[in-house]
């Protein structure tokens, strides 16, 4: 069982590293954030099932709901930015360019 936890933590660290490396593209950042949320969901589910915490069974579902809301808002932002500017570079976007 510890190898599963190690793999999930490694997946989270890889997604975090991907967020840091690909921070200039909005789509890549959103994909890495989704990977982080998926690994957090899996890790919290496994911890709750292994510890037999019956009061916390709803926590992973709540995390999954917030991840879906984050994905919907991120995709709406991506569509808005790509329709307005024609690209998804975060560095080129500035409020001073009006």
Curated annotation (Swiss-Prot):
Catalytic activity: a ubiquinone + NADH + 5 H(+)(in) = a ubiquinol + NAD(+) + 4 H(+)(out)
Domain of life (superkingdom): Eukaryota
Keyword terms: Electron transport, Membrane, Mitochondrion, Mitochondrion inner membrane, NAD, Respiratory chain, Translocase, Transmembrane, Transmembrane helix, Transport, Ubiquinone
The keyword Electron transport appears for this protein: yes
Pfam families the UniProt entry points to: Oxidored_q2
Predominant localisation class: mitochondrion
InterPro entries named in the record: NADH_UbQ_OxRdtase_chain4L/K, NUOK/Mnh_C1-like
EC number: 7.1.1.2
Transmembrane segments: 2-22, 29-49, 61-81
Keyword DNA-binding: no
Subcellular location as annotated: Mitochondrion inner membrane
Gene3D superfamilies to which the protein is assigned, alphabetical: 1.10.287.3510
Membrane topology type: Multi-pass membrane protein
Gene Ontology MF annotations: NADH dehydrogenase (ubiquinone) activity
GO cellular component, one term: respiratory chain complex I
Gene Ontology BP annotations: ATP synthesis coupled electron transport
Subunit and partners: Core subunit of respiratory chain NADH dehydrogenase (Complex I) which is composed of 45 different subunits.
Family that this chain belongs to: Belongs to the complex I subunit 4L family.
The protein's role, per its UniProt record: Core subunit of the mitochondrial membrane respiratory chain NADH dehydrogenase (Complex I) which catalyzes electron transfer from NADH through the respiratory chain, using ubiquinone as an electron acceptor. Part of the enzyme membrane arm which is embedded in the lipid bilayer and involved in proton translocation.
Name of this chain's protein: NADH-ubiquinone oxidoreductase chain 4L
């Amino acid at each position: 069982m510890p190898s599963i936890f190690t793999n999930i933590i490694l997946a989270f660290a890889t997604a975090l590293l991907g967020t840091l490396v690909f921070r200039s593209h909005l789509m890549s950042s959103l994909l890495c954030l989704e990977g982080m949320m998926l690994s957090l969901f899996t890790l919290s589910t496994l911890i709750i099932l292994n510890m037999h915490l019956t009061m916390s069974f709803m926590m992973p579902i709540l995390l999954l709901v917030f991840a879906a809301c984050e994905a919907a808002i991120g995709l709406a932002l991506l569509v808005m930015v790509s329709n307005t500017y024609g690209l998804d570079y975060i560095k080129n976007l500035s409020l001073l360019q009006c």
